[in-house]
Curated annotation (Swiss-Prot):
Record organism: Exiguobacterium sibiricum (strain DSM 17290 / CCUG 55495 / CIP 109462 / JCM 13490 / 255-15)
Keyword Ribonucleoprotein among record annotations: yes
GO biological process: translation
This protein's UniProt keywords: Ribonucleoprotein, Ribosomal protein, RNA-binding, rRNA-binding
Organism domain of life: Bacteria
Protein's UniProt name: Small ribosomal subunit protein uS8
């Protein structure tokens, strides 16, 4: 089966595993998925991420993070720019998610980064997703 939107698939896998409080999940790896997972780790939304090499494209293993009383760290994920409707924003038009409590992941000419980093570097790009 051909996957038309690998980022939406990644976000859905994370959302589903998070809802049933799984400790980890695995998915087929790609460069953009690895970059998004590293951002989620750096921003404290997931505990860890591993890349497992195999004969094909590799596997990405994501370890989810939960609070002290097992509450979810990720409360929501939303795909913004889709293959059928791309969403682009200039540096000064990149939206803040929940007044700065969440992050927007933006694909720019300087790589994949958070909305805050894109504003600091004054670069716009494709708004991939919101995470809060």
């Amino acid at each position: 089966m051909v996957m038309t939107d690998p980022i939406a698939d990644m976000l859905t896998r994370i959302r589903n595993a998070n809802m049933v409080r799984h400790e980890k999940l695995e998915m087929p790896a790609s460069t953009i998925k690895r970059e998004v997972a590293e951002i989620l780790k750096r921003e404290g939304f997931i505990r860890d991420v591993e890349y497992l090499e195999d004969s094909k494209q590799g596997t990405l293993r994501v370890f989810l993070k939960y609070g002290a009383s097992n509450e979810r760290v990720i409360t929501g994920l939303k795909r913004i720019s889709k293959p059928g409707l791309r969403v682009y924003a200039k540096a000064d038009e990149i939206p803040k998610v929940l007044g700065g409590l969440g992050i927007a992941i933006v694909s720019t000419s300087k790589g994949v980064m958070t909305d805050k980093e894109a504003r600091q570097q004054k670069v716009g790009g494709e708004v991939i997703a919101y995470i809060w």
